[in-house]
Amino acid sequence: MDTFIREFDMALRAIAGATRSGRANPADRLAPDDGQLEQAERRHVAGLMRVNHVGEVCAQALYQAQKLTARNDDVRTQMDTAAREEEDHLAWCAERLRELDSRPSLLNPLWYAGAFAIGFLAGRAGDKVSLGFVAETEHQVEQHLSGHLDQLPAADGRSRAILEQMRDDEIRHGDAARAAGGVPLPAPVRALMRGASRVMTTAAYRI
């Protein structure tokens, strides 16, 4: 029962945007950028950061589901550790959205539910498949973050600092999943994941 309550609390905090970072926000070492971005740039950056926030909501759901279905205690611990770092990402993105006078996606409950279902299915397929799913997810997120970094205005050092740290963490999570025995996913599954990601990013940018 304690585990259920804890996991349910984590889900509510992820959806509501009430998470707290266990690490310092990478943007805190930079000065505020009030007035440095044009209005159109602020809107675009807000859209990008909303997409990244949704990605972290989904990461919480995926890791939570895969943690609950893990057979091996070491795998469960690895999922929990990664989820805590992803929670940092969630808090950083939420803070940046507030700085930009914007908001998270209105569809966060839907994104969370869908990601949890996918993570549960991956976890039920076995630890090696589940770890392989983590590795592929983190690889695609790494590519996605690199694309967003290319789109950031030169004056937006705060968003850049956040996304660069997030990308470093995602690379490390993917490497750890492969090292723990994650198996490569079939090409059709990888393609399906990319397609689902495109739907999410397109909708979350606006809604």
Swiss-Prot record:
It catalyses: a 5-methoxy-2-methyl-3-(all-trans-polyprenyl)benzene-1,4-diol + AH2 + O2 = a 3-demethylubiquinol + A + H2O. Keywords: Cell membrane, Iron, Membrane, Metal-binding, Monooxygenase, Oxidoreductase, Ubiquinone biosynthesis. It is an enzyme of class 1 (oxidoreductase). Gene3D superfamilies: 1.20.1260.10. GO terms for molecular function: 3-demethoxyubiquinol 3-hydroxylase activity; metal ion binding. Its EC number is 1.14.99.60. It is a peripheral membrane protein. Its cofactor is Fe cation. Fe cation 1 binds at residues 56, 86, 89, 170. InterPro entries: COQ7_proteobact, Ferritin-like, Ferritin-like_SF, Ubq_synth_Coq7. It comes from the Bacteria. Fe cation 2 binds at residues 86, 138, 170, 173. Catalyzes the hydroxylation of 2-nonaprenyl-3-methyl-6-methoxy-1,4-benzoquinol during ubiquinone biosynthesis. HAMAP family: COQ7. Belongs to the COQ7 family. This is 3-demethoxyubiquinol 3-hydroxylase. The lineage of its organism: Bacteria, Pseudomonadati, Pseudomonadota, Betaproteobacteria, Burkholderiales.
